[in-house]
């Protein structure tokens, strides 16, 4: 497995693989790998001949009060896991490499990023779409795999890819869960034992909402009340937002769920200083 740190070497490596008619799949990460990330590699290798992983803790997507400095950095462990999963190359640039002195160009997706994470974390999605655009240009992939857990991020990247005509297929990867249903996340390590035990309330709430919809409930207000009530049953849980949105536009649905439409149920809940995101897709 190659480890590349410079833009020119990464571009040259990808170009040589393309000349050899290899299909390239990229898996962008911030490191601190877990089974969810490794499932992205597995999916990439179903769509491509070669898996490239990027490991970059992106300063542009962290707000001033967020955990950039303490975000876990475990590169040696990550490299070992990536190689075992079948990654052929890791691109691991420094912030100075991607954002040299004088850098001033950013990529912004407007409407999709306005609410929810975009409202609570100003500038976050501008940082995400900027770095992803750069990584597409540097790694030159045919396909790029992103997890469905970060649903608003996935929607923003899909919109960017479409609007800016990136010749990259965006492949969504299903959420990977612990045995008790908690969505795998690099931030789960911040939970203390009591918080970790109660964190299952997110997936439980989604399952309750799915069941209600399967049994005919279509009123959004009623569904949100069901979700909120179950989350509040966990004493340590503090909801940031609970919503049902159109899966493509990410616009909130206010009244009734309609037949032949696709929705996302979104949850973001705080346990102490740790924010956990989860969602489920509803196709009617």
From Swiss-Prot:
Gene Ontology annotations of biological process type: pantothenate biosynthetic process
EC number: 6.3.2.1
CDD domains: PanC
Active-site residue numbers: 37
Function per UniProt: Catalyzes the condensation of pantoate with beta-alanine in an ATP-dependent reaction via a pantoyl-adenylate intermediate.
Subunit structure: Homodimer.
Protein name: Pantothenate synthetase
UniProt source species: Chloroherpeton thalassium (strain ATCC 35110 / GB-78)
């Amino acid at each position: 497995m190659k480890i590349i740190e410079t833009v020119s070497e990464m571009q040259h490596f990808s170009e040589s693989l393309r000349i050899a008619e290899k299909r390239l799949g990229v898996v962008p990460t911030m490191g601190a790998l877990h089974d969810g990330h490794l499932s992205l590699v597995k999916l990439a290798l179903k769509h491509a001949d070669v898996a490239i992983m990027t490991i970059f803790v992106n300063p542009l997507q962290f707000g001033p009060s967020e955990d950039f400095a303490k975000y876990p950095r475990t590169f040696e462990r990550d490299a070992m896991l990536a190689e075992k999963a079948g990654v052929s190359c890791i691109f691991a640039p420094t912030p100075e490499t991607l954002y040299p002195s004088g850098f001033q160009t950013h990529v912004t997706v407007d409407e999709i990023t306005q609410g929810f994470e975009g409202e609570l974390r100003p500038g976050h999605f501008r940082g995400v779409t900027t770095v992803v655009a750069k990584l597409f240009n540097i790694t030159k992939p045919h396909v790029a795999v992103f997890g469905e857990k970060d649903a608003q991020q996935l929607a923003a990247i899909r919109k960017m890819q479409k609007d800016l005509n990136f010749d990259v297929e965006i492949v969504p990867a299903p959420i990977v869960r612990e045995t008790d249903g908690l969505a795998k996340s690099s931030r789960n390590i911040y939970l203390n034992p009591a918080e970790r035990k109660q964190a299952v309330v997110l997936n439980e709430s989604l399952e309750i909402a799915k069941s209600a919809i399967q049994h005919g409930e279509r009123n959004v207000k009623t569904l949100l009340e069901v979700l909120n009530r179950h989350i509040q049953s966990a004493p340590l849980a503090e909801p940031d937002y609970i919503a049902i949105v159109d899966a493509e536009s990410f616009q909130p649905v206010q009244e009734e769920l309609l037949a032949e439409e696709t929705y996302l149920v979104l949850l973001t809940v705080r346990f102490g200083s740790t924010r956990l995101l989860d969602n489920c897709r509803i196709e009617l």
